């Protein structure tokens, strides 16, 4: 009985520490990752804007459902193993010649324990394309904030996205900060 109480006490203590540390962390964060691809900017652009085909190359996305537009913006629901997250396309400018393409998406559900935007910039390089993702994220729940910062990492989803895009084209990409 004594050991059970000690174990319970330690677990409660750890939980309290996680909540306290999470509460002390800032809600917002900025993270950036990039990768080079052999494909042209137009091919990369087509892949990252054709959200209905995400399940064919993004391992964590099992289905995509088009939702009604919101304030003139395209909205869709991405479903994965444990969740469904709606996204809103805030900005979409295709790359053209030497001009950089830009896509801005936003998590479109304020009830989730996290939110924010991704800005994807598509630029031509010698022999291919550079795709840079910048996340302006917010994590509202202190426990999730702790987990995001110290367990999962705030760049994991971006890195998975870039690696999956490379795999779609038969490339092994090198992730850059």
Residue map of PLM features:
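Intrinsic-disorder/low-complexity, polar/charged segments enriched in Ser/Thr/Lys/Arg/Asp/Glu/Gln
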Residues: 28-36, 84, 102, 117, ...
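Short coil/turn motifs at beta-sheet boundaries
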Residues: 26-28, 80, 113, 126
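Beta-strand/loop substructures that line and gate deep hydrophobic ligand-binding cavities in soluble
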Residues: 88-91, 104-167, 171, 175-177
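Short beta-edge strand/loop motif at the mouth of beta-sheet-based domains
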Residues: 52-102
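Broad hydrophobic/π-residue packing in well-ordered secondary structure
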Residues: 45-47, 54-58, 74-78, 105, ...
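Hydrophobic ligand-binding cavity/cleft-lining segments
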Residues: 4-68
């Amino acid at each position: 009985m004594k050991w059970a109480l000690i174990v319970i006490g330690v677990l409660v203590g750890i939980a309290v520490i996680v909540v306290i540390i999470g509460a002390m962390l800032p809600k917002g964060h900025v993270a950036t990752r990039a990768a080079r691809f052999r494909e042209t900017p137009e091919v990369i652009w087509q892949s990252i804007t054709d959200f209905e085909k995400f399940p064919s190359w993004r391992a964590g996305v099992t289905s995509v459902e088009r939702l009604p537009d919101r304030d003139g913006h395209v909205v869709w629901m991405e479903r994965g193993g444990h969740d469904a997250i709606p996204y809103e396309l805030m900005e979409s400018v295709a790359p053209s010649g030497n001009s950089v393409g830009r896509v801005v998406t936003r998590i479109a559900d304020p009830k989730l324990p996290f939110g924010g935007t991704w800005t994807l910039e598509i630029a031509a390089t010698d022999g291919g394309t550079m795709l840079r993702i910048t996340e302006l994220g917010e994590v509202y729940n202190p426990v999730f904030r702790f987990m995001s910062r110290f367990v999962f990492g705030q760049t994991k989803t971006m890195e998975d996205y870039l690696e999956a895009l490379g795999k779609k084209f038969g490339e092994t990409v090198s992730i850059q900060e």
